[in-house]
């Protein structure tokens, strides 16, 4: 398993540990795995090499019938989250039902973590895009936090796509790179990551080698 691969995990929260120099290090506690392999996709059949892994045991009422059959075919119980991991190399060292754990990583490794950012709801242009806003007084009325002009009049006659305006903020896919593994606790499937990672507490994450 020399090829770089990742596993699914769940953010449990943040704490701090003390390094060898005695300084406190902020870390994010992540439950990484165990992730059984549900399906192996190959170039010959699907057109590309990939592993389909699962994480977090789920209830029958939360899993569709098609996915229930998919898990049953693999001889596995039901899971809440499923993820596909593309690989370039050979898949001979993997088999359906094989479990991937935090043993894939080592202390000091650099990893990248993908998750969904914390949702902020509907926000104005000042908070969402850091706009300056209008004057507080002297001729300014009811537009103190307005976005301002959003385009010309006759030409082009419409608002360009991508214009920064008020709207929903957060719950977007975010990837943070070059995060360092501070500690690994295999008996609890716990991995400690230096610094913060995307998403709220209990959200799902995908952790892969940098």
From Swiss-Prot:
State the GO CC annotations: cytosolic large ribosomal subunit
Which UniProt keywords are given for this protein, alphabetically ordered? Ribonucleoprotein, Ribosomal protein, RNA-binding, rRNA-binding
* Gene3D superfamilies associated with the record: 3.30.160.810, Translation factors
GO molecular function terms here? rRNA binding; structural constituent of ribosome
- GO BP annotations listed: translation
InterPro entries found in the cross-reference section: Ribosomal_uL3, Ribosomal_uL3_bac/org-type, Transl_B-barrel_sf
Describe the family membership recorded for this protein in Swiss-Prot or TrEMBL: Belongs to the universal ribosomal protein uL3 family.
**What role does it play?**
One of the primary rRNA binding proteins, it binds directly near the 3'-end of the 23S rRNA, where it nucleates assembly of the 50S subunit.
Assembly notes: Part of the 50S ribosomal subunit. Forms a cluster with proteins L14 and L19.
Protein name per Swiss-Prot or TrEMBL:
Large ribosomal subunit protein uL3
Q: Which organism is it from?
A: Lawsonia intracellularis (strain PHE/MN1-00)
State which gene encodes it.
Answer: rplC
């Amino acid at each position: 398993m020399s090829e770089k691969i990742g596993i699914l995990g769940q953010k449990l929260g943040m704490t701090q540990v003390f390094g060898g120099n005695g300084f406190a290090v902020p870390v994010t506690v992540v439950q990484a795995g165990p992730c059984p392999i549900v399906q192996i996709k190959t170039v010959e059949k699907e057109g590309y090499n990939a592993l389909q892994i699962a994480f977090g045991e789920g209830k029958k009422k939360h899993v569709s019938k098609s996915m229930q059959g998919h898990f049953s075919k693999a001889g596995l119980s039901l899971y809440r989250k499923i993820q596909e991991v593309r690989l370039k190399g050979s898949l001979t060292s993997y088999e359906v039902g094989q479990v991937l754990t935090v043993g894939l990583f080592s202390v000091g490794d650099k990893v990248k973590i993908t998750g969904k950012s914390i949702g902020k709801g509907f926000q104005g242009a000042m908070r969402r895009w850091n706009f300056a806003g209008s004057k507080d007084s002297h001729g300014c009325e009811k537009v103190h936090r307005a976005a301002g002009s959003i385009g010309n009049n006759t030409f082009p006659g419409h608002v360009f796509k991508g214009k920064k305006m008020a709207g929903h903020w957060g719950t977007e896919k975010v990837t943070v790179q070059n995060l360092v593994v501070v500690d690994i606790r295999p008996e609890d499937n716990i991995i400690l990551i230096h610094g913060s990672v995307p998403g709220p507490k209990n959200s799902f994450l995908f952790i892969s080698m940098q």
